[in-house]
Structure formats: structure tokens, C-alpha cells
């Protein structure tokens, strides 16, 4: 079924300029709607780990983008305190008490998740925003004013602290989603964007900014890398001097690496304060 869906959506993408809410084949509408439904249920996801490597399913990103071409903006009631005007309804717009109980997660007002995002059991959504295509796995806390961008992949038992920004990547289409693996802690007001991968059991301190052009300096080895935080890293904000010493520029510094056992036993503050 997925291969057939993919073919229909790939073909529709090539002819997307001809599509509109009033002009789209029924086959395309049904395929896109089904893909969004499967993303919403977590049956499909934009990226998944296969044999130890992350694989991105670009056709599902195409399905999300096509859904914007196929839908008109429409008023959306917001419980009497406001109205919204958009193409994508709330994930929880038609939820009953039974639906919430079956989902097994908490949604604290006024948290918003768009339809097409997946929220797993034991997730807590504080007043936050989760965009279409995102996948938030079991036991994760999305704290107040945190944002989970389109198609971002958040692992199990992750803590996204207050005001954290996880970037979305619907465009450019070739871009990979941000991935936060299992058991990571992302400190308050930090930003992870542009397809950066934070591997499992890592701790990102408050106010760390990670994009593809951010230098990641490992102080134990002196190595500089980009785009990936290795498993078990403890990362703080820092600076590196220019070659001529006239100025310094922002970087992220890996101050130490810890295994999962140490990560579980040692408090976060102790990890971040250690020399």
C-alpha cells in the first residue's frame, strides 16, 4: 500500500502546479489524505532508523506540502476565546474523552498540535506547538513555549525545556528533519535546526544553538565537526578564536561524554557544572 501511495504522491508532486483545492484528481486527494492520516496515527513517519541509520522518506514530506495545495483556508473555532483561519485543523479538534484516554498523553491548555503530527503515550504537552509531520515518542515532555517543527523526530523520554525551538524542514524539500534521539535533555531556549541530529543520551545546556554551520568543538580531542552531536555528549555554548586572534565566533562545546548508566545516576546540574 505504501509503495502505491508513494507513486501517486510522487507523480502528483511533479504536476503540483496544476493542483488546487478546486482542481485535483480524486486519486491524489485520497492518497494525500491517507498519508496525513497515517502520519497522524504514527503508522508512517517522515524519518525512521533502519539498521542503525536514519532514513528520510521524502515522499511523505511531499504529501504534507501537497496537502496545503489541496485545501482552502477555513475558520476553525477555538473554544469561544478566539478563531483560527488555516488549512490544517487541530489534531485534537474532534477528540472525545475516550480518544484522549486511548492516546495516553496529556495536553495542557493552550497547547496546539496540528493534524498529521503523532503524539505517543505518556507524552506531556505543556502550552507548546507541534507542527504537522512531527513525531513525538513515548515519555517525552514538551515544556512551555517549546516548538516542535514540521517533520521533526523526537525520541523516547526526551525533555524539551521551556522555549526550546526544534526546527522544521518542509522546504527546501531535500533538507533532512531535525532528529532528537532517545533520553536527551535539551536546555531552555536552545535551538536545534537544519536537520541536526542529537544522538541518544545527550545533554544540551541552556541557550545552545545548533545548525548545519555551527562548529561543534570537542574539547577532549580538539576536533571540530558539524551537524551531529555524538551519543552521550554534554554540550554547552562557547566561542572559538579566529585564526588571527582578532575576534571569536560562537560554537557549541562538547565538554564531556557520559554513558547511559552515568547519565541516569548523575544529576543534570552536576553534569553541566563539572570541569
From Swiss-Prot:
Cell compartment(s), UniProt: Cytoplasm
GO BP field: diaminopimelate biosynthetic process; lysine biosynthetic process via diaminopimelate
Record field: catalytic activity: (S)-2,3,4,5-tetrahydrodipicolinate + succinyl-CoA + H2O = (S)-2-succinylamino-6-oxoheptanedioate + CoA
Residues of the signal peptide: none
Enzymatic class: transferase
Residues spanning the membrane: none
One annotated Gene Ontology cellular component of this protein: cytoplasm
Pathway named in the protein's UniProt entry: Amino-acid biosynthesis; L-lysine biosynthesis via DAP pathway; LL-2,6-diaminopimelate from (S)-tetrahydrodipicolinate (succinylase route): step 1/3
Keyword Disulfide bond: no
Top-level taxon in the UniProt lineage: Bacteria
Enzyme Commission designation: 2.3.1.117
Database matches in PROSITE patterns: HEXAPEP_TRANSFERASES
SUPFAM superfamilies for this protein: Trimeric LpxA-like enzymes
Key words, A-Z: Acyltransferase, Amino-acid biosynthesis, Cytoplasm, Diaminopimelate biosynthesis, Lysine biosynthesis, Repeat, Transferase
Keyword flag Metal-binding: no
Gene3D superfamilies, per database record: Hexapeptide repeat proteins, Tetrahydrodipicolinate-N-succinyltransferase, N-terminal domain
GO molecular function: 2,3,4,5-tetrahydropyridine-2,6-dicarboxylate N-succinyltransferase activity; nucleotidyltransferase activity
Disulfide bonds: none
Similarity remark: Belongs to the transferase hexapeptide repeat family.
Record HAMAP family: DapD
Protein name: 2,3,4,5-tetrahydropyridine-2,6-dicarboxylate N-succinyltransferase
Protein species of origin: Burkholderia multivorans (strain ATCC 17616 / 249)
Gene of this entry: dapD
